[in-house]
Amino acid sequence: MSALSLLSPSAATDAAWLAAADVADVAAQLQVRYRLVGGIAITLLTHHYGISHRVPSRETADADMGVPRDVCGDERLLPALESRGYVREGGNRFVRHDGTRELTIDVLGPAPGAKLESNQEIGGLSVDLIPGLLAALLLEPVNVSLVAHLTDGTELAMTLALPDVRGALILKVFAYAGRFTDRDASDVGRLLEAAVEGGFAETDWPQTPVGREAAHLLHQFFGSTTPSLPGSSAPHSWSW
């Protein structure tokens, strides 16, 4: 487990870290498997692999809690979030206020295949099922012990389960293929830098149908003929 001590650059990051701490607390209380996914997890992976100074920084104000389908339908999940002051807004979004901060947790489930399945009724939630999340849940997590220094001087300690960088890449390349945003492209670049720094090779890539589809998308959109990623120092070509 890596130990990180990070300064928050903004109120938005304060909110994301506070929400992430709540995600970890809920998972520990219920004793369920989860991965913290999305922009905040990618940023933490760049610090875990020691490359944050080489890649673009990106702020996010929310925390995405990726969990197996049975956890989405767990009748204890909603009370656990509500006991921490969260109010449900929409099918799978939970919000609480901490002073002037608005903390947001989105609960996400794994899609069975390579396509996003929006607004799926599971238990009492209407959940987006995300392609690649199952791969991220099956791979061992990257556990980090974080001391977050918030902008008001508060120190917040937490232990977080991040996706393996390969799982994070699978998640993010599917996200890019679904919406083609510069933000997602930059995140792919950050994760590729982390994967190279971590010593991962082509033979380490998950050989599942979803893993192979993600590899195809990486080659298609981020191969040797693809322009440099927006805001990234990542090279133009990759062995994957």
Language-model regions, residue ranges each:
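Compositionally biased terminal segments of proteins
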Residues: M1-W240
